[in-house]
Amino acid sequence: MTKAIGIDLGTTYSCVGVWQNDRVEIIANDQGNRTTPSYVAFTDTERLIGDSAKNQVAMNPHNTVFDAKRLIGRKFADAEVQSDIKHFPFTVFDKGGKPYIRVQYRGEDKEFSPEEISSMILTKMKEVAESYLGGTVTSAVVTVPAYFNDSQRQATKDAGTISGLNVLRIINEPTAAAIAYGLDKKTVGERNVLIFDLGGGTFDVSLLTIEEGIFEVKATAGDTHLGGEDFDNRLVNHFVQEFKRKHKKDLSSNPRALRRLRTACERAKRTLSSAAQTTIEIDSLFEGVDFYTSLTRARFEELCQDLFRSTLEPVEKVLRDAKIDKAAVHEIVLVGGSTRIPRIVKLVSDFFNGKEPNKSINPDEAVAYGAAVQAAILTGDTSEKTQDLLLLDVSPLSLGIETAGGVMTPLIKRNTTVPTKKSEIFSTYSDNQPGVLIQVYEGERARTKDNNLLGKFELAGIPPAPRGVPQIEVTFDIDANGILNVSASDKTTGKSNRITITNDKGRLSKEEIERMVNEAEKYKAEDEEATARITSRNALESYAYNLRNSLTDEKLADKFDAADKKKLEDAVNSTISWLDNSQEASKEEYEEHQKELEAVANPIMQKLYAGAGGAPGGAPGGFPGGAPGGFPGGAPAGEDGPSVEEVD
């Protein structure tokens, strides 16, 4: 029997999944990517769909079609269609009241409806699934935004039919995401679920209630023009300016240079979700000039901070419209690749008073995941296992934390059946250590460096005590879905922190780990030097931006003495501009600048805080020893002061 698939037909990217071997598989395309750009291109010789279409857009802008989802099921006269058309490089014209797209294909003019373009993308996703499954696929569940009206839904269904698919059902994207997390199975009674979906081109917030498997959309809000591409634009503009400053040339008139820069910016943005800094290197970007630069997470967040903040308005609107207090939201689900950005996760979590959102399924895959589950249910292909059995029967590798000296201390031994839970008590390694860094590893080797790091987090605010006195309870908890929760709490203060780690793709195979360990030995010395440099750069940058924020903070701005304020502003601005022009300075140079800036800032800040009961100190510490840095907002520790793991 042929399988039914689930397709997330997105504005910028699409994704396909299938229920197989009692779990959902998200299927990679021929380029090895688990999401495929929703792009179709027409050339003199061929039609391209997906990655190949997106990759040649700079050379062929007028015949590369994207964002068809913004046109599907709408009238040409629709105000939104009119405003979108202004920004499209391809031609959209009125045909019988509907928007049609005109391109050149093999030397002649062709006209396509948005349904036809979407059907080409669906065909591509169908083929991706077929080459993986080794057979024909005829049925699919396709998702649409919750706010899509009947004509947009019908048009999407038609696109499916054109692509040769029997569309079993059109379901709402937020509903699919909730199904992916099995939220419809969690408990009895009504649950309020907020879905925060920040994709490549659009931002949607939905509030659903789920009761006994029935989903009801209570309210939706969002911004149809806010997404990852806007963050890329900010980076592109930033680097166009930097290129102007450094090389006195304006590359914005050259579409190919812009496209290459945009691709590099998109890659850098993705890297900064897991790293604190990244480099951009583009050979011969414009007029033969090589462009080498770097970008820190702090800078990226500053460039986009107004966009990031604006995501909370629709959240408030949805709660108002549904007449629900934020405390009554049972579950928050993050969807869309842009919710990988740590700052966004933090904004959402802080808005809900520290409540942790569900993000254990890859956010750009959650919708396709839920659609695949739904497709399996509709075709009765759940082979007597329900969704509760997306489970890992045993934990395949030991799981533990790093203790002093880089030792692997396992809490859950390999081949333990799951679900399971295990706790142990640990303590500090040095006197008066105010924080511990919990690093979670999987593997069988005695030293953590030979194992695979799954994630880490900091537990700060431990009261001063001799080494070995504080009691820190670390708990490992694996649920039936193979999702690992690790928490640490200080027995004295009750302070706690946690991390969720999912078991799925992205884990390394043993061979890869071995190979990486061997390579890492070689590069270790270079890495350490680079790490020290980056750390001191980040510390300085973080410090400078925090001072700048203090200067503009409404609560503090009027408390500064005017002369002091001017002096501090000049020092901060000169430091930031030096940083911009000194990507490759040495650790010592960064530290020297840090000292100079502290010499100006400390007396001024002390004066300011004298009335407020003392300056907040940087939270020092680190379990096996954190990297130097400084909690944003704290005064960094001096040379001999303790160091701290940088925490965002």
Swiss-Prot record:
UniProt GO cellular component terms: cytoplasm
Pfam families (UniProt xref): HSP70
Main localization, broad class: cytoplasm
Compartment(s): Cytoplasm
Assigned keywords, A-Z: ATP-binding, Chaperone, Cytoplasm, Nucleotide-binding, Stress response
Extent of Gly residues compositional bias: 611-636
Keyword ATP-binding tagged: yes
Organism domain of life: Eukaryota
SUPFAM superfamilies hit by this protein: Actin-like ATPase domain, Heat shock protein 70kD (HSP70), C-terminal subdomain, Heat shock protein 70kD (HSP70), peptide-binding domain
Any one GO molecular function term: ATP binding
Region Disordered, annotated ranges: 609-648
Family listed: Belongs to the heat shock protein 70 family.
NCBIfam families noted in UniProt: PRK00290.1
Name of this chain's protein: Heat shock protein HSS1
Gene (UniProt): HSS1
